[in-house]
Amino acid sequence: MEKTEKRLDGPALEKLGLNPEDIAPATAEERAASDQMRPSVGYWKDAMQRFRRNKLAMVMLGILIFIILCAILIPVFSPYTYKGRTPDVRQGPTWAHPFGTDKLGRDILVRVMYGTRISLLVGVVTMLLVCLIGISYGAIAAWVGGLCDNLMMRFVDLMMTIPSMLIIILLSVVLRDPIKKMLSDPQWNALASIGSGLISIFAVLALFNWLGMARSVRGALLMNRTQEYVLASEAMGAKASWVVKKHLLPNAVGIIIISATGVVPSAIMTESFLSFIGLGVAAPVPSLGSMANDALNGIISYPMNMVYPAAIICLIILCFNVVGDALRDALDPRMRK
């Protein structure tokens, strides 16, 4: 038996006690207003959507991921090593050696990718150390407050007035031999494989790059310090460490991410400069800075030996800077409309 659709007209609706105007179809203006309404989204979901809408940042992120994968996989699957020599000395790009070879017959592509590993390792480790020191220092200053906060922040201001590059160079020279002597002890065999040069770079870079992180974290925590939910937790007897861990730091994650992304390119640039002047990793381990220095002698005849490491350094720093700016725009509440 077929079902027929029966529509109610105006008189029929009035008999039912309904006003026809209340159930009339929506007008074009009402439909347009309804289409503009969107369901509410959380902070992180909104930040991710804003980041994905930044096309330039997505392109740079893809390039950065590609460089990281090449740095990991090419030295693994290549038949050459970073220190292995071949009879082909100063050879141009070929199928066997896409970037050519250097004056000792070593494959430049493998050495550039291995140097990229070193640069990325320096950037990531420095970022982790900076987060550890800066977050702890800023959280203590913000929570304790008063005279202790003033003294701690004045120390940060004093450290920021010191010419960091000069001190970094001096400390790299001073710390190299003590660290090398320490690593000769069998109990430090795990760190000995990293090398005294890299460890000294980690130490000196973390020593001067945590200052901005500490100030950012302190400012974010002070902004949330007087919020009602924090005061309620204190009134209920919550410990200071619990309040900082559960309430204050989670609300400062966006600021921490923004500050951390700025540390990586700065650390990579400083490490490349130190390696360029001979204070980086020890030979024969390649670094992008040391490879650029080695290419200086033949820059007229073999300019590409200088171009390859320099281009990778510039590209990595550019990618991190663009992605960092996009993260700042996405995570900063002041940028949200």
Regions found by a protein language model. Name each.
Residues 1-135, 139, 147-150, 161, ...:
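Gly/Trp-centered helix-boundary motif
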Residues 98, 108, 129-133, 142-143, ...:
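Generic hydrophobic transmembrane alpha-helix motif, especially the helices
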Residues 145-146, 160, 164, 177, ...:
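Short, conserved catalytic or interaction motifs in soluble domains
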Residues 106-121, 125, 145-153, 222, ...:
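Amphipathic cytosolic juxtamembrane alpha-helices at the membrane-cytosol interface
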Residues 219-229, 326-334:
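Transmembrane helix boundary and interhelical loop/hinge segments in multi-pass membrane proteins
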Residues 74-82, 142-146, 171-180, 184, ...:
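Short helix-capping/hinge motifs at transmembrane helix termini and TM-loop junctions
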Residues 171-175, 188-193, 205, 221, ...:
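Glycine-rich helix-loop "coupling/hinge" segments at transmembrane-helix boundaries
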Residues 29-30, 118-122, 137, 153, ...:
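Short alpha-helical transmembrane interface motifs in multi-pass membrane proteins
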